[in-house]
C-alpha cells in the first residue's frame, strides 16, 4: 500500500487540559493526551520530526500515522482495542471493557535481522519506527523520568565509594539530551558538582531553561575553575560545557585531572543519529548520515573508542567509573577496545538490589494539567509511606527543583505492594473529587521485570541469563491479561538494535470500581514479575521478597 510519509511538520502539539473529553471515555482520552504530551515542545527533543528523545525515538511513524492515531483514539469504543505497529495504527478489534484500549509493538525484528543496518533500511521505506522506551509507548514525562534513577545511582555510588557523602566532590559525564539531561540535576540533588559535556548548544539551552543544569562554562579551563571553586566551597552546582566528549575526556586524562566519579549518557546506542564524531559539526553529521551512513557510523564509533579509552584511563586512576546504559562500551569494543567492559554498568554496580524487590521507576501524570493534582498525590505518598525518610526527601527535592514539562507528572521509585497501594489511593482521590481529573500511572521500560538487556538492566546476572528475553514478553502478556489501559513491547531501547527487548505498561485511575480492580491486578503483577525474574536467577533478596509478599512461584515458593 502506497502512502505519503511526512516526518516533518511545522506544528505545535500540546495535550488537552481539564475535564472536557475529546474521546469517548477517559480510557481513550488518556492515551490520546499522553501521545500528544510526548510531542509537547516543552517535553520532546525534536517534536516537529516526531522525535521525543534518544536519538530518533519517535511517538509515531510519521505525521500521517499520528493524525490517524489521534482520529482513531477519539472514536474508539469502550470495548475496542487499537493495535499500533511501529508507530502506525493498523487495526481496531472488538475485545472487552477490561482489555487494554491500545496494544503497541515497536521496532521488533527477528533476531538475525535485528541490527541498525536492517532497521535503517526499513525506516527509510517507512516500514518501521524506533520507539526507544517511553517515546513510542506514550509515557515520556521529560527528563524527570530518569532523574530519580540517576539520583539513586549517584547516592548509592556515594555510599559505596565516599562513605555516603558527595559534598565537595564532582561527577564527570556527557550528554544533555532527554535522558542525559537528568544527570546534572541528579548530581546536584545527591550533593555533588557535575561537569556535563554536550555537543549541541540547543540541548544545553533546553536544560538551562528547565533548570536541570545551573550554568554554562565558556571553555574547559573555565569549567575546571568553576568545579574547583564550587567543590572547595562545598556547593553542588552543575556546569554545562559545549564540546565533544571524545576530545575533552582524553584532554582531561592528559592533564591529570581526577574527577570523583565518571559516567556517560550520550546517545551512543545509535552511531548514525546520536553520537557526533570528533572534528565534525552537527550539521555536517546529519547531512552525511543521509549520503554516506556507513562512513558516519565508522567515524562515530572511532570517536566512541577514544571516549571509552579515556573512561578506562580514569578507572585506572582509581576513579569510580561506570556505564549508564547507552551501550558505549559495546560500540568501543567493536572498534577495537578489547577491555571496554572493564568498568561495570550501573545496574549491577548500584541498582540490582532494588530490582530484586520490584522497586523501580513508578511514575504518574495529571491529565487535568493542574500541578495541584501532583502536589496532592505527593502528600498522599508521604501519608501512605510515612517512615521512608529517603523517599520523603526525594519528593521534597522534586517539588522544589524539578520543573514540570508538559502535563504535570511525578516519578517515585517504589516496589511490590506499594505501587498497588498508591494506585488505589490515587483512584479513590479521583472518585472523591480531591483530584480534578483522572491520573495515568506508568513506568519506564527500565524496570525490574520488563527488560532483557545484557549490556544494561540484565548485565552480569548471577545465573548467566542476561540475554533471555522471555521475561519482558511474559511481563507484557500478564499486564495485558490484567487489564492495563495500554501495553507496549519494544526492541532496541536504550542500547540500540539487537541489544534489548522490553515492555511498558500504563493504567488509568478514573475513579471507578472497575478501574480499582484493574489497578490492584496490574500494579501488583507488574512489579511481581521483577521479583519473579530475579528470584528465578537465584538472588536471595528476591527469593525472600517473593516469600514475604506471598508470590506463587512454583519452583521457588511452593
UniProtKB/Swiss-Prot annotation:
- Origin: domain of life: Bacteria
Against PROSITE patterns, the record matches this protein to: UROCANASE (PS01233)
Give a GO molecular function annotation for the protein.
Answer: urocanate hydratase activity
> Which catalysed reactions does the entry list for this protein?
4-imidazolone-5-propanoate = trans-urocanate + H2O
Provide this UniProt record's keywords sorted from A to Z. Answer: Cytoplasm, Histidine metabolism, Lyase, NAD
Which positions, given as ranges, span the membrane? none
Family to which the UniProt record says this protein belongs: Belongs to the urocanase family.
UniProt protein name: Urocanate hydratase
Q: Which organism is it from?
A: Acinetobacter baumannii (strain ACICU)
**Organismal lineage:** Bacteria, Pseudomonadati, Pseudomonadota, Gammaproteobacteria, Moraxellales
Report the gene name.
hutU
Amino acid at each position: 500500500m502506497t502512502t505519503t510519509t511526512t516526518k516533518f511538520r511545522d506544528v505545535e502539539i500540546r495535550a488537552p487540559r481539564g475535564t472536557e473529553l475529546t474521546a469517548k471515555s477517559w480510557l481513550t482520552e488518556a492515551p490520546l493526551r499522553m501521545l500528544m504530551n510526548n510531542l509537547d515542545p516543552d517535553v520532546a527533543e525534536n517534536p516537529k520530526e516526531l522525535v521525543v528523545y534518544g536519538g530518533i525515538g519517535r511517538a509515531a511513524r510519521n505525521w500521517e500515522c499520528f493524525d490517524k492515531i489521534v482520529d482513531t483514539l477519539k472514536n474508539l469504543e469502550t470495548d475496542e482495542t487499537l493495535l499500533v505497529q511501529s508507530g502506525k495504527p493498523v487495526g481496531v478489534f472488538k475485545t472487552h471493557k477490561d482489555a487494554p484500549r491500545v496494544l503497541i509493538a515497536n521496532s521488533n525484528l527477528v533476531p538475525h535481522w535485528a541490527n541498525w543496518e536492517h532497521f535503517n533500511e526499513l525506516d527509510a521505506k517507512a516500514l518501521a519506527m524506533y520507539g526507544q522506551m517511553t517515546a513510542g509507548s506514550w509515557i515520556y514525562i521529560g527528563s524527570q523520568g530518569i532523574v530519580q534513577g540517576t539520583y539513586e545511582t549517584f547516592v548509592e555510588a556515594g555510599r559505596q565509594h565516599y562513605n555516603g557523602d558527595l559534598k565537595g566532590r564532582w561527577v564527570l559525564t556527557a550528554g544533555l539530551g532527554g535522558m542525559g539531561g537528568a544527570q546534572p540535576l541528579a548530581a546536584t540533588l545527591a550533593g555533588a558538582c557535575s561537569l556535563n559535556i554536550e555537543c549541541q548548544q540547543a540541548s544545553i539551552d533546553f536544560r538551562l531553561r528547565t533548570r536541570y543544569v545551573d550554568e554554562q562554562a565558556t571553555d574547559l579551563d573555565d569549567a575546571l575553575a568553576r568545579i574547583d571553586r564550587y567543590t572547595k566551597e562545598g556547593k553542588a552546582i552543575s556546569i554545562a560545557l559545549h564540546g565533544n566528549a571524545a576530545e575533552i575526556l582524553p584532554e582531561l586524562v592528559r592533564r591529570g585531572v581526577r574527577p570523583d566519579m565518571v559516567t556517560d549518557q550520550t546517545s551512543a546506542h545509535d552511531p548514525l543519529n546520536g553520537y557526533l564524531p570528533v572534528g565534525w559539526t552537527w550539521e555536517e553529521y546529519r547531512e552525511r548520515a543521509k549520503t554516506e551512513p556507513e562512513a558516519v557510523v565508522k567515524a562515530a564509533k572511532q570517536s566512541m573508542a577514544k571516549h571509552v579509552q579515556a573512561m578506562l584511563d580514569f578507572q585506572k586512576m582509581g576513579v569510580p567509573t561506570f556505564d549508564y546504559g547507552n551501550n558505549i562500551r559495546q560500540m568501543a569494543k567493536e572498534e577495537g577496545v578489547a577491555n571496554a567492559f572493564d568498568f561495570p554498568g550501573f545496574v549491577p554496580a548500584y541498582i540490582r538490589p532494588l530490582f530484586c524487590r520490584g522497586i523501580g521507576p513508578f511514575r504518574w501524570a495529571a491529565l487535568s494539567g493542574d500541578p495541584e493534582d501532583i502536589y496532592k498525590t505527593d502528600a498522599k505518598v508521604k501519608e501512605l509511606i510515612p517512615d521512608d525518610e529517603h523517599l520523603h526527601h526525594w519528593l521534597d527535592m522534586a517539588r522544589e527543583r524539578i520543573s514540570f514539562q508538559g502535563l504535570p507528572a511525578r516519578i517515585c521509585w517504589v516496589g511490590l505492594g506499594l505501587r498497588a497501594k498508591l494506585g488505589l489511593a490515587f483512584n479513590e482521590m479521583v472518585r472523591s473529587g480531591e483530584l480534578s481529573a483522572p491520573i495515568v500511572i506508568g513506568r519506564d521500560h527500565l524496570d525490574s521485570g520488563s527488560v532483557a538487556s545484557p549490556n544494561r538492566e540484565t548485565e552480569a546476572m548471577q545465573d548467566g541469563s542476561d540475554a533471555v528475553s522471555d521475561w519482558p514478553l511474559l511481563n507484557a502478556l500478564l499486564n495485558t491479561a490484567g487489564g492495563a489501559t495500554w501495553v507496549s513491547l519494544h526492541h532496541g531501547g536504550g542500547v540500540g538494535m539487537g541489544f534489548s527487548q522490553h515492555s511498558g505498561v500504563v493504567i488509568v485511575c478514573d475513579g471507578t470500581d472497575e478501574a480499582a480492580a484493574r489497578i490492584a491486578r496490574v500494579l501488583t503483577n507488574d512489579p511481581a514479575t521483577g521479583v519473579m525474574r530475579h528470584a528465578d536467577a537465584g538472588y536471595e533478596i528476591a527469593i525472600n521478597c517473593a516469600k514475604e509478599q506471598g508470590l506463587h512461584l512454583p519452583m521457588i515458593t511452593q
